[in-house]
């Protein structure tokens, strides 16, 4: 077998492969034997059809099968022999073939680029330094108390976090609009459920009052006919309720986890907050490292690899929204191309870090990561056992750990500054992505 490789535009390559005639003929004869074993021809018993008839009837199909199989086999032999870093599927083009002659074909494909990392020392990373305070714990306790809260009717003026029952009628330029009217609508204020200015217009009014609120719909509002429009809402305030938070008693504490005292609950909450904080800081640092790697190392990515990643993102999107698998192909590729390209870039850059530094997965760290995940559940031992039985889940964790190790290698060479940050600020940044 002879092999010649041409470099085309960018990452495209073309390989021409020639396979010896005797190899093709030997494969052809074996293929005919297979046809002969199963061929049914009138006047002959199964497996007893003369060779000439078998060749006459099935020779063309047998040769096509042989040539197709040989292109696949010979190409992948060439990939191994020439150490080609293949990206995506090849396109085969057979040349004219005559029986008893050598067979040649071309395969066009893309390769992954050879990446030589540079500029790691120019990557700037700001690492949040956070101390979880007693005030942070108090806020988290209040969240739990609000989950168990009750409401008490009040004759006082509505405040920013009260719950109200209202009738309202909205109009634009004096005309009511669709979806702008409701009766006995219950609104828990302070959660930004309504358009800006709506809740603020209720604050200060008492039950039984009727009044108007002037607001402006945001430019990004979902209803096209209301975007940026000034509107008036006629409000009837029927009821005002104040939130009543439960006392921090042992009975209240026992509703959450295994804690028996307020001190136990605070310790448990702090442990959970520390875990969330660690994950958020790790994610923030990793994102900065990756952004820096991309900025310092502009690399061309194979279109085939991006296309494959687009398909992955399509399927994930359909699955996330509960659609049928066949709907994935209907989603426009351009919706996912930017994310797909970034994923391929990140994969190539981190793979280069891993390969260059000969990194191996830290198995102890894998065990610690699984244990940390399990600690968030009521039965951590069962979660650990579940990971032990599920090879794919464990492999996912191993990949995450190896990526973290690669990020740490880059981080050791980058310009890292520490910034004192509050718990709320870090978690808000995490929520924004």
Swiss-Prot record:
Enzyme Commission code = 5.2.1.8
Q: Which UniProt keywords apply?
A: Cell cycle, Cell division, Chaperone, Cytoplasm, Isomerase, Rotamase
Chief localization: cytoplasm
Q: Which residue positions does the secretion signal occupy?
A: none
PPIase FKBP-type domain: from which residue to which, for each copy?
161-246
GO cellular-component term (any): cytoplasm
> Pfam families from the xrefs?
FKBP_C, Trigger_C, Trigger_N
According to UniProt, the reaction catalysed is: [protein]-peptidylproline (omega=180) = [protein]-peptidylproline (omega=0)
Q: Name one GO biological process term.
A: cell division
Localization terms from the record: Cytoplasm
Gene Ontology molecular function terms on file:
peptidyl-prolyl cis-trans isomerase activity; protein folding chaperone; ribosome binding
Q: Briefly, what is this protein's role? A: Involved in protein export. Acts as a chaperone by maintaining the newly synthesized protein in an open conformation. Functions as a peptidyl-prolyl cis-trans isomerase.
Family annotation (PANTHER family): TRIGGER FACTOR CHAPERONE AND PEPTIDYL-PROLYL CIS/TRANS ISOMERASE, TRIGGER FACTOR-LIKE PROTEIN TIG, CHLOROPLASTIC
Q: What is known of its domains?
A: Consists of 3 domains; the N-terminus binds the ribosome, the middle domain has PPIase activity, while the C-terminus has intrinsic chaperone activity on its own.
Q: Which HAMAP family match?
A: Trigger_factor_Tig
* Similarity section: Belongs to the FKBP-type PPIase family. Tig subfamily.
What name is this protein filed under?
Answer: Trigger factor
Q: Which organism is it from?
A: Actinobacillus pleuropneumoniae serotype 3 (strain JL03)
């Amino acid at each position: 077998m002879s092999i010649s490789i041409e470099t085309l535009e960018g990452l495209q390559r073309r390989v021409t492969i020639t396979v010896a005639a005797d190899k093709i003929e030997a494969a052809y004869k074996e293929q005919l034997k297979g046809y002969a074993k199963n061929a049914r021809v009138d006047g002959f018993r199964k497996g007893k059809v003369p060779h000439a008839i078998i060749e006459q009837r099935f020779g063309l199909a047998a040769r096509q099968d042989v040539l197709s199989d040989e292109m696949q086999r010979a190409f992948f032999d060439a990939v191994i022999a020439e150490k080609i870093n293949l990206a995506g599927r090849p396109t085969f083009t057979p040349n004219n073939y005559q029986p008893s002659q050598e067979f040649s074909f071309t395969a066009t494909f893309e390769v992954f680029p050879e990446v030589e990392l540079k500029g790691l020392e120019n990557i700037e990373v700001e690492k949040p330094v956070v101390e979880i305070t007693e005030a942070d714990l108090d806020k988290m306790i209040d969240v739990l108390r609000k989950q168990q809260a009750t409401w008490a009717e009040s004759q006082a003026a509505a405040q920013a976090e009260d719950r109200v029952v209202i009738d309202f009628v909205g109009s634009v330029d004096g005309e009511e609009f669709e979806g702008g009217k409701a009766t006995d609508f219950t609104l828990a204020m302070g959660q930004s459920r309504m358009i800006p200015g709506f809740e603020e217009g209720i604050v200060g009014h008492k039950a039984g009052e009727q009044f108007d609120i002037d607001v402006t719909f945001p430019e990004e509002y979902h209803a096209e006919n209301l975007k940026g429009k000034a509107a008036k809402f006629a409000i009837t305030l029927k009821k005002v309720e104040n939130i009543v938070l439960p006392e921090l008693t042992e009975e209240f504490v026992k509703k959450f986890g295994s804690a028996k005292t307020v001190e136990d609950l605070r310790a448990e909450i702090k442990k959970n907050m520390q875990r969330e904080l660690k994950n958020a800081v790790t994610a923030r640092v990793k994102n900065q490292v990756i952004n820096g790697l991309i900025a310092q190392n502009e690399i061309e990515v194979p279109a085939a690899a991006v296309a494959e990643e687009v398909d992955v993102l399509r399927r994930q999107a359909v699955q996330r929204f509960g659609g049928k698998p066949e709907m994935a192909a209907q989603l426009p590729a351009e919706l996912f191309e930017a994310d797909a390209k970034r994923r391929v870039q990140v994969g190539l850059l981190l793979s280069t870090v891993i390969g260059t530094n000969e990194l191996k997965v830290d198995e102890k760290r894998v065990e610690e990561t699984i244990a940390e995940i399990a600690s968030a559940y009521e039965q951590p031992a069962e979660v650990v056992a579940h990971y032990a039985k599920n090879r794919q889940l464990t492999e996912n964790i191993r990949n995450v750990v190896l990526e973290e190790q690669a990020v740490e290698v880059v981080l050791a060479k980058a310009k890292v500054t520490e910034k004192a940050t509050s718990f709320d600020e870090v978690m808000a940044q995490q929520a924004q992505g």
